Amino acid sequence: MVRQSISLKAELEEIQNIFPATYKIFFLKIKCSNCGEIPDKWIGLDKSNIEVIGKSNVNLATKCKGCNRENSIVIEDTDYSSRTIESEKDFEIARFDCRGVEIEEFDPRDNWIVVSSSGKEYKDVDLEEGEWSEFEERTSTSLTILSIESSIKKIK
């Protein structure tokens, strides 16, 4: 079993927080821990998809094409909605319990919630292009997210 977290880092202007929506689908590339096989296709993983393996509920059950090993991933319950993040510093966006696989790549895509410095929430934000901007008329401020980078870490 390997627990991993995904963090983002970006240049932020007038942004207080970024976190995945409840229905966020995480697009990942995974590597089999047994044979090292990395499929070419992105795998979509979301909390609402629950599969039963033995006595466990998992969000993804997959079989490695290289060695036929059964593997699984569970998205851990976390709440990032009440924090404040800083520009150009890593901030965690998800944790995973991986059995038989390791996360190799992450593609942010869509379904993010962005909170401005004034507290206004923007829903269904798409970060696929690596940047996002909006003008908040109420406060006459420009909101920007630039140079998004992701990192994957093993955690205890």
Curated annotation (Swiss-Prot):
Pfam families: CXXC_Zn-b_euk
Record-linked InterPro entries: CXXC_Zn-binding_euk (IPR008584)
GO molecular function: zinc ion binding
Binding site for Zn(2+): C32, C35, C64, C67
Domain of life according to the entry: Eukaryota
Record protein name field: UPF0587 protein
Native source species: Dictyostelium discoideum (Social amoeba)
Membrane-crossing segments per the record: none
UniProt domain comment: Requires a bound zinc ion for normal folding and solubility.
UniProt key word Repeat: no
Similarity field: Belongs to the UPF0587 family.
UniProt keywords, alphabetically: Metal-binding, Zinc
